[in-house]
Amino acid sequence: MEETTIGAVLFDGIEENPYLNELYDAILYNYGRQLFGLTNLPEKEISVPAALRFADILSKSVHTQNEETHKLWAQELVALLNALRPDDELIQYYLGSVLTRVSNFRGVSLKAADYVSADLLDRIFTQVSKEYLRIPEAENEYFFRAQKEIYEKFNEPYFSYSAPTSLGKSYI
């Protein structure tokens, strides 16, 4: 029997989960309906607690190939739900949790500044992550992890990288 981790079992193929995709499609539909003012179209029913649970799970992905995709999807789910229901306290809590878990501290400061995890270990991990990702000479600004990895290689004798615009290359 081949050894595996619980993370590999949990996250392998999650992006193909029919219920997750059904929820995602309904969220996108409702967001498009709201964005374009198509109130004549019926709103699709969404189980917000289920969508938030999926976002929470995806934000904790350790999948070897799809970790970044899962974490981006988690952020998208909570951002869209927040746009649909900006006054929902449960969505606000998950928004802060997901953004913190994926180390999107800029997003936390903009959209979930009041978020504080109920878990002590999460709060400690967040503080350590924030200190690690802090931009030198900028007290309340943080790199994304990929940006930090690039920044740390600037002093190497040979350095080259290629990345999509969404990485924020000009910011580095």
Language-model-detected regions and their locations in the chain:
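N-terminal helicase ATP-binding lobe
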Residues: M1-I172
